[in-house]
């Protein structure tokens, strides 16, 4: 299994990137929490990876931190949670925020993540509660954090806004919902990555 890759960043189309590793191009899907930390195109970057093998495709997921990959692996062990939903969860919350929500049994926060209904959220609470406390600090670190919600508007005609909307749709949001979230952000100078970050915060 491919566990780690270091190479030159060739393309960035959230949540997907193309990484050149010694002449071989690897397509990876990243949660937005990892995507935000990527360098500029042409720069070197290193990612922890997890390979998902399906009958119709081999999907490679990348993570900036080992803790993100650890949580991803825990999530896909949960009944009813596949790689796409795990990616959406990690895009909506940091590891610390998710662990805190689980330990505090914040069902209302979990159901706001696209693709997570009440039954799935309840299953996550049952299957993951308590797992974070016994894991070493280098794997998980729980702290109290609450997301701030922006309350402004944005011109949807901006190219970064269009890219942000496309990325949110890829993460499981409906088109109308993605557009509404991006419109709430009032800073047209923001990059697509910044817009995605703020939109995901607003969704929670």
From Swiss-Prot:
It is found in: Cytoplasm. Its main location: cytoplasm. Keywords: Cytoplasm, DNA damage, DNA recombination, DNA repair, DNA-binding. The keyword Cytoplasm applies. GO terms for molecular function: ATP binding; four-way junction DNA binding; four-way junction helicase activity. Residues 156-204 are annotated as: Domain III. GO terms for biological process: DNA recombination; DNA repair. Residues 65-143 are annotated as: Domain II. Residues 144-155 are annotated as: Flexible linker. GO terms for cellular component: cytoplasm; Holliday junction helicase complex; Holliday junction resolvase complex. SUPFAM superfamilies: DNA helicase RuvA subunit, C-terminal domain, Nucleic acid-binding proteins, RuvA domain 2-like. Residues 1-64 are annotated as: Domain I. Coiled coil: none annotated. Pfam families: HHH_5, RuvA_C, RuvA_N. Belongs to the RuvA family. The RuvA-RuvB-RuvC complex processes Holliday junction (HJ) DNA during genetic recombination and DNA repair, while the RuvA-RuvB complex plays an important role in the rescue of blocked DNA replication forks via replication fork reversal (RFR). RuvA specifically binds to HJ cruciform DNA, conferring on it an open structure. The RuvB hexamer acts as an ATP-dependent pump, pulling dsDNA into and through the RuvAB complex. HJ branch migration allows RuvC to scan DNA until it finds its consensus sequence, where it cleaves and resolves the cruciform DNA. Homotetramer. Forms an RuvA(8)-RuvB(12)-Holliday junction (HJ) complex. HJ DNA is sandwiched between 2 RuvA tetramers; dsDNA enters through RuvA and exits via RuvB. An RuvB hexamer assembles on each DNA strand where it exits the tetramer. Each RuvB hexamer is contacted by two RuvA subunits (via domain III) on 2 adjacent RuvB subunits; this complex drives branch migration. In the full resolvosome a probable DNA-RuvA(4)-RuvB(12)-RuvC(2) complex forms which resolves the HJ. Has three domains with a flexible linker between the domains II and III and assumes an 'L' shape. Domain III is highly mobile and contacts RuvB. This is Holliday junction branch migration complex subunit RuvA. It comes from Pasteurella multocida (strain Pm70). The gene is ruvA.
């Amino acid at each position: 299994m491919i566990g780690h890759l270091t190479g030159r960043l060739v393309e960035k189309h959230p949540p997907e990137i193309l990484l050149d590793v010694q002449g071989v191009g690897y397509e990876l899907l990243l949660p937005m929490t990892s995507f935000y930390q990527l360098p500029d195109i042409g720069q070197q970057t290193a990612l922890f990876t997890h390979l998902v093998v399906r009958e119709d495709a081999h999907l490679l997921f990348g993570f900036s931190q080992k803790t993100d990959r650890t949580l991803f692996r825990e999530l896909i062990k949960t009944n009813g949670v596949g790689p796409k939903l795990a990616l959406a969860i990690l895009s909506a919350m940091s590891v610390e925020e998710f662990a805190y929500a689980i330990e505090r049994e914040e069902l209302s926060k979990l159901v706001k993540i696209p693709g997570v209904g009440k039954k799935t959220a309840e299953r996550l609470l049952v299957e993951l509660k308590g797992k974070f406390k016994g894991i070493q600090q280098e794997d998980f670190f729980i702290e109290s954090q609450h997301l701030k919600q922006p309350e402004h508007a944005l011109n949807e005609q901006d190219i970064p806004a269009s890219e942000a909307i496309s990325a949110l749709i890829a993460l499981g949001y409906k088109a109308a919902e993605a557009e509404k979230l991006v419109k709430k952000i009032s800073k047209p100078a923001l990059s697509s990555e910044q817009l995605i970050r703020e939109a995901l915060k607003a969704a929670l």
